[in-house]
Amino acid sequence: MSIYLIALLPVLGWGFMPIIANLRKSTPEEQLLGTSISALLFAFILFWILSPEITVLSFIVSFVSGIFWSFGQLLQFKGIAASSVAKAMPISNGTQLVGATLFAVLVFQEWQTVTAVIIGVVAVILILIGVVMTGFQKRGNHITESVSFHVYGIVILSSFFLTLYVVTNQLFDVTGFSIILPQAIGMLTCAIGINLAKKTAISRKNVTFNLMTGLSWSIANLGMFLATAVLGVATSFSISQACVIVATIGGILIFKQKKSPLEWTFILSGILLIMVGVVFLSLLK
C-alpha cells in the first residue's frame, strides 16, 4: 500500500509543478533557475544520504541529460506563458510520450511483433487525438482548436529536448541514483548560462519562489525512482502519467478559467484518451 502512495508522488509533483511555477509572475528563465537550484540542493541531500557510485561515464551522460532537461523545461515554461497550464501540459505530456515511444521503436527496436505494432500505433493515435481534444474551445455555436500553431511549435520542441533528457541515460545504460546529482549539476549549469545569455535583470524573489517548483519536481523524480524499483517500469510509468490530470484540471480550477460543459466534456475525454494510450504503451514495456 505504501509503495502505491509513493508512486503517487510523481502524479502530484509533476502535476503541481507547472501550477506552482505560475502562481507568481516570473519569467520562464527565472522559473528555470529557481527549479534547477532547488533540484541541485535536493540532489546533494540524496547523494549525502545514499552515496551512490558515480563513474566518469555516468557523470558525463547524466550531465548532458540535465542540459537537455533545461532546454526542454525552458521551452515548456515558455509554452505555458504563451497559453496556460491547462492548454500546454496535455500537449507536453502527450508529445513526450509519443517522442519516447518513437525513440524506443527506432533506436531500441522495440515492438518486435505485429501485435506490439498494432497496440503501439493505436496508443499513439489515441494520445494524439486526446492532446488535440484538450485544446478545444467553444466560440459561439462552434468548437474550435484554441491552441495556436506557435504554442504547439514551442511545446513540441520542448518535448523533443525532454525526450532526449529521458532517453540519454537509457541509451548509455546509466541507471539508478547515480544519475541524480550530475544531472542536477547539468540542469543548473545550463540554467545559469541561459540567464546570463539573456542579459536582463533577474528577480531574486521570483527565483526564490520557484525553489518550490524545483522541490515539487524533485519529490516527483524521487518518487519515480522508488516506485520503478519496486513496481517496475510499466506500472510506475502508467501511474506517473496521471500528472496530466492534475496539471490540466488543477490549472483550470486554481487559475479560475471558465469552461462550458461542452468544453469540459472535450477536456475530460481528451485526458481519458491520453491515459488509455498510456495504459496501452505500458503493456509493451
UniProtKB/Swiss-Prot annotation:
It is a multi-pass membrane protein. Signal peptide: none annotated. The keyword Transmembrane helix applies. GO terms for molecular function: carbohydrate transmembrane transporter activity. The chain crosses the membrane at residues 2-21, 31-50, 55-77, 111-133, 146-168, 172-194, 207-229, 233-255, 262-284. GO terms for cellular component: plasma membrane. Keywords: Cell membrane, Membrane, Sugar transport, Transmembrane, Transmembrane helix, Transport. It is found in: Cell membrane. Belongs to the GRP transporter (TC 2.A.7.5) family. This is Putative sugar uptake protein lin0444.
